[in-house]
Amino acid sequence: MGKTAIDVWEQIKLLESRGMVIKDKEKAQEVLLDAGYYRLGFYWFPFETTYPNKINRTHQFREGTNFDYIVKLYYFDFNLRSILMKYLNRIEIHFRTFLIYKVSNYYRTSPTWFADSTVVTAAYVRKFDQEVYTNRFKSISIIQQHHKTHINDKYAPAWKTLEYMTLGGIIHLFKALKDKMICRAISEHFKVRQLPVFESYLKTILTIRNYCAHGNVLYDIALPTSIRRGPAGQMESANYHLSLIHISEPTRLR
């Protein structure tokens, strides 16, 4: 398209001039205005003659490339994100809940253990105080109400504060825990014996979750790090993992 904006009908003509078959131009207009020419470009790229070369692209399409193929791939990606997001949210909530439960019960006399340098690294405490709690969490109404009620508390307890932490923040906190026995206990709760493997899973889950949340193209995602295939400790079957986080679909009544 170059650096000059063109309207949707010009976009359709441009695609046709490059060899794309567009049978229903009204529908193509609707899709282009809904998803956008640039975004759809990620989905028609595999149909270009120079694919997968991103340098010196000709933008010409392979013979027989139909706009309908691109639309189907786009909606496949859309639906894939929706499905993954549903289950990734459940994983995120369960991981956060169990971490708060496990560590809070281990350090019962320290309800704000996330800011205790005997529990987590000093570097984490400094960053949390400056960048997280003061700048973001104190604007949350429930946290504000806690400080109005408990005026001498520097922080709200973990079960309040950490509920508002992102998955990335929770993973960062998990890795900052000094007692790796607690980390291993959490890892084994998810039936993964090896802590490094569990952390690699968390990193992958975070990457995919962020892709889904931000509407990024998912069908050809290239993960920055690989994850181990096969047993990761395999203390139970795959069905156990589903039942553990309660994400299996409810059984239909017969």
Label each residue range with its predicted role:
Residues E199, S237-S243:
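Extended, compositionally biased non-globular segments
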Residues G2-V197, Y219-D220:
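Short, contiguous, well-structured surface segments enriched in hydrophobic/aromatic residues
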Residues P224-A238:
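Short, charged amphipathic alpha-helical segments flanked by flexible coils
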Residues I245-R254:
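Single conserved hydrophobic/aromatic residue that forms the stacking wall/gate
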